[in-house]
Amino acid sequence: MGCGMSTEEKEGKARNEEIENQLKRDRLQQRNEIKMLLLGAGESGKSTILKQMKLIHEGGYSRDERESFKEIIFSNTVQSMRVILEAMESLELPLEDQRMEYHVQTIFMQPAQIEGDVLPPEVGNAIEALWKDRGVQECFKRSREYQLNDSARYYFDNIARIAAPDYMPNDQDVLRSRVKTTGITETTFIIGDLTYRMFDVGGQRSERKKWIHCFENVTTILFLVAISEYDQLLFEDETVNRMQEALTLFDSICNSRWFIKTSIILFLNKIDRFKEKLPISPMKNYFPDYEGGDDYAAACDYILNRFVSLNQHETKQIYTHFTCATDTTQIRFVMAAVNDIIIQENLRLCGLI
C-alpha cells in the first residue's frame, strides 16, 4: 500500500489550510476594524451622529432615501403640534384667537403616522396658523414641563416649505427627524485605512438590557449627553431629571468592568439649545451647587467636571467635545479629531506605541 494521502485526507488538509488562512485574514481585518459603541440616554443625539457619518463619509442620501424620510418628517411635525395642543389643555393655556379651534380639530383628526408623499394642505395650513398664535407660543416656551421633540420649532418654522407639493427633504430636515431606536443598528463606513463599525443602541431604559451583546472587543465608546436637558424629566419616568439619569448611566459605563481598557469619548451635545435655555431656565434650580449664573462657559465647565469626575480609573482617559449634532461642519471637524484619537488608541492596543 502506498504512503500517499487519500482524497479524504487531502480535502481535510485543504480545509484546515483554508480555515488558517481565514483566521489570518480575520486577524488582519480586526486590526483595521474599529468597533465603536454609541451610548447615551434616549434622545441624546446618537442616531443624528450616525446620519452625519452617512453625510460626511458615504456621499449623503439618495433621492429615494430622502423620499423615505417624508412620512417621518410629516409625522414628527404633526405629532409635535398635537403634543403642544394637549399640553395647553393640561396647563390651562387658552388660544389667543378662538377661531383657531377649527385648526386644532384638524390636527387632532390626523393619525399618529402620516402617510403619503405630500402633507395634506389643510394640515400645513393648520400648523402654520397655530404656530403664530400667542397661546401656542406661550405653551412652547414651557416645553420643559412636558415631552416635546427638539425638532418641533425647526419644522414649524419651515412648514410652508415642508407642506409644498414638490417638497423634498434636505440634509437638515433628515438630521432633525426622529424615530425611536429599538434594538441595535449597525452602520459601517471607511475612513482612510480604517473600517468603522458603529453600533447605535436604544437609549430608553427598556432598551439598555440589550447593550450587553455589543460589549465584546469594543475599541471605543462614544457617549452622548444632551446637556440642554438639565431642566427636563425622563420620558419613561417623570420623577427623574434627564441630566441626573445621564450622570448615573455614564458612571455605570465609565467604571464598568467590561470597559476597563476601553477609551471613552464624551460628546456634550445640543450646545445650541443649552445656550438658549440658560438665561430662561436657571441651572441652579436643578443643580443647587452650581454658582455660575447664566454664564455659558461656567455652565459648560460645571457639566464637564460633573461627568469627568465620575471616572475612578487613574489610567483611563476621557476625551471630551462640546457638540451640536445637527451641525455637519462642526461634526466633520470633531470626528476628524476622534479619528486621530482612535488611531492612537489602536496603535497602543497593538503594542506599536
Swiss-Prot record:
Residue positions binding Mg(2+): 47, 181
Record-level GO BP terms: G protein-coupled receptor signaling pathway; pheromone-dependent signal transduction involved in conjugation with cellular fusion
GO molecular function: G protein-coupled receptor binding; G-protein beta/gamma-subunit complex binding; GTP binding; GTPase activity; metal ion binding
Pfam families associated with the record: G-alpha
Biased composition (Basic and acidic residues): 7-21
CDD domains: G-alpha
SMART domains per UniProt: G_alpha
Region G1 motif, residue ranges: 35-48
Lipidation (S-palmitoyl cysteine): 3
Residue segments, region G3 motif: 196-205
Ranges for domain G-alpha: 32-353
Region (G5 motif): 323-328
Residue numbers spanned by region G2 motif: 173-181
Region of interest: Disordered: 1-21
Region (G4 motif): 265-272
N-myristoyl glycine: lipidated positions: 2
Cellular component terms (Gene Ontology): cytoplasm; heterotrimeric G-protein complex
Required cofactor names: Mg(2+)
Keywords on record: GTP-binding, Hydrolase, Lipoprotein, Magnesium, Metal-binding, Myristate, Nucleotide-binding, Palmitate, Transducer
Binding positions for GTP per the UniProt entry: 43-48, 150, 175, 181, 203, 269-270, 272, 325
Family the entry assigns: Belongs to the G-alpha family. G(q) subfamily.
Task of the protein: Guanine nucleotide-binding proteins (G proteins) are involved as modulators or transducers in various transmembrane signaling systems. Plays a role in pathogenicity, specifically in appressorium formation in rice blast disease. Also involved in mating.
PANTHER family for this protein: GTP-BINDING PROTEIN ALPHA SUBUNIT, GUANINE NUCLEOTIDE-BINDING PROTEIN ALPHA-5 SUBUNIT
Subunit details: G proteins are composed of 3 units; alpha, beta and gamma. The alpha chain contains the guanine nucleotide binding site.
Protein name: Guanine nucleotide-binding protein subunit alpha
Upper classification of the organism: Eukaryota, Fungi, Dikarya, Ascomycota, Pezizomycotina
